[in-house]
Protein backbone atom coordinates (compact mmCIF):
# COMPACT_ATOMS: atom_id res chain seq x y z
CA UNK A 1 0.00 0.00 0.00
CA UNK A 2 1.15 3.48 -0.78
CA UNK A 3 0.75 6.40 1.60
CA UNK A 4 -1.12 9.54 0.60
CA UNK A 5 2.21 11.31 0.13
CA UNK A 6 3.56 8.51 -2.07
CA UNK A 7 0.39 8.56 -4.16
CA UNK A 8 0.82 12.30 -4.63
CA UNK A 9 4.33 11.66 -5.99
CA UNK A 10 3.01 8.92 -8.27
CA UNK A 11 0.26 11.24 -9.48
CA UNK A 12 2.88 13.87 -10.26
CA UNK A 13 4.92 11.28 -12.18
CA UNK A 14 1.83 10.59 -14.31
CA UNK A 15 2.29 14.06 -15.77
CA UNK A 16 4.32 13.32 -18.83
CA UNK A 17 6.16 15.46 -21.35
CA UNK A 18 3.68 14.45 -24.04
CA UNK A 19 0.02 15.45 -23.93
CA UNK A 20 -0.86 12.19 -25.69
CA UNK A 21 0.47 10.27 -22.69
CA UNK A 22 -1.11 12.60 -20.15
CA UNK A 23 -4.58 11.85 -21.50
CA UNK A 24 -4.17 8.08 -21.13
CA UNK A 25 -1.93 7.68 -18.07
CA UNK A 26 -3.51 10.18 -15.66
CA UNK A 27 -7.11 8.94 -16.02
CA UNK A 28 -5.92 5.37 -15.51
CA UNK A 29 -4.13 6.38 -12.33
CA UNK A 30 -7.10 8.34 -10.99
CA UNK A 31 -9.70 5.70 -11.81
CA UNK A 32 -7.84 2.40 -11.47
CA UNK A 33 -4.68 2.63 -9.35
CA UNK A 34 -6.35 1.88 -6.02
CA UNK A 35 -8.05 -1.19 -7.51
CA UNK A 36 -4.79 -2.75 -8.71
CA UNK A 37 -3.00 -5.49 -6.81
CA UNK A 38 0.17 -4.51 -4.97
CA UNK A 39 2.29 -6.07 -7.73
CA UNK A 40 0.34 -4.23 -10.42
CA UNK A 41 0.80 -0.98 -8.51
CA UNK A 42 4.55 -1.61 -8.41
CA UNK A 43 4.50 -2.37 -12.15
CA UNK A 44 2.64 0.88 -12.80
CA UNK A 45 5.12 2.91 -10.75
CA UNK A 46 8.00 1.19 -12.54
CA UNK A 47 6.37 1.93 -15.90
CA UNK A 48 6.36 5.63 -15.06
CA UNK A 49 10.16 5.51 -14.93
CA UNK A 50 10.30 4.64 -18.64
CA UNK A 51 11.11 7.26 -21.25
CA UNK A 52 8.16 8.98 -22.91
CA UNK A 53 9.04 7.84 -26.46
CA UNK A 54 9.10 4.20 -25.33
CA UNK A 55 5.85 4.53 -23.40
CA UNK A 56 4.19 6.27 -26.35
CA UNK A 57 5.32 3.51 -28.71
CA UNK A 58 3.86 0.84 -26.43
CA UNK A 59 0.57 2.67 -25.83
CA UNK A 60 0.13 3.22 -29.56
CA UNK A 61 0.73 -0.48 -30.21
CA UNK A 62 3.83 0.07 -32.35
CA UNK A 63 5.98 -2.02 -30.06
CA UNK A 64 5.93 -3.94 -26.81
CA UNK A 65 8.08 -3.70 -23.71
CA UNK A 66 10.31 -6.68 -23.00
CA UNK A 67 9.41 -6.22 -19.33
CA UNK A 68 6.31 -8.39 -18.83
CA UNK A 69 5.03 -6.23 -15.97
CA UNK A 70 5.26 -3.12 -18.12
CA UNK A 71 3.64 -4.85 -21.10
CA UNK A 72 0.76 -6.06 -18.94
CA UNK A 73 0.27 -2.62 -17.43
CA UNK A 74 0.25 -0.97 -20.86
CA UNK A 75 -2.43 -3.48 -21.89
CA UNK A 76 -4.51 -2.46 -18.86
CA UNK A 77 -4.06 1.25 -19.56
CA UNK A 78 -5.05 0.84 -23.21
CA UNK A 79 -8.05 -1.36 -22.35
CA UNK A 80 -9.23 1.15 -19.75
CA UNK A 81 -9.07 4.01 -22.21
CA UNK A 82 -10.75 2.02 -24.97
CA UNK A 83 -13.60 1.14 -22.62
CA UNK A 84 -14.27 4.85 -22.16
CA UNK A 85 -14.76 5.51 -25.88
CA UNK A 86 -17.08 2.59 -26.61
Curated annotation (Swiss-Prot):
Transmembrane segments: none
Superkingdom of source: Bacteria
Protein's cellular compartments: Cytoplasm
Record-level GO cellular component terms: cytoplasm
Gene Ontology biological process terms from the UniProt entry: succinate metabolic process
Main location: cytoplasm
Alphabetic keyword roster: Chaperone, Cytoplasm
Keyword ATP-binding: no
Family under the similarity heading: Belongs to the SdhE FAD assembly factor family.
Function: An FAD assembly protein, which accelerates covalent attachment of the cofactor into other proteins. Plays an essential role in the assembly of succinate dehydrogenase (SDH, respiratory complex II), an enzyme complex that is a component of both the tricarboxylic acid cycle and the electron transport chain, and which couples the oxidation of succinate to fumarate with the reduction of ubiquinone (coenzyme Q) to ubiquinol. Required for flavinylation (covalent attachment of FAD) of the flavoprotein subunit SdhA of SDH and other flavinylated proteins as well.
Name of the protein in question: FAD assembly factor SdhE
Source species: Vibrio vulnificus (strain YJ016)
Organism lineage string: Bacteria, Pseudomonadati, Pseudomonadota, Gammaproteobacteria, Vibrionales
Amino acid sequence: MYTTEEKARIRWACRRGMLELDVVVMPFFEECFDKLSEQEQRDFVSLLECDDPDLFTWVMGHGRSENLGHASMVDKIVAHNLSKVR
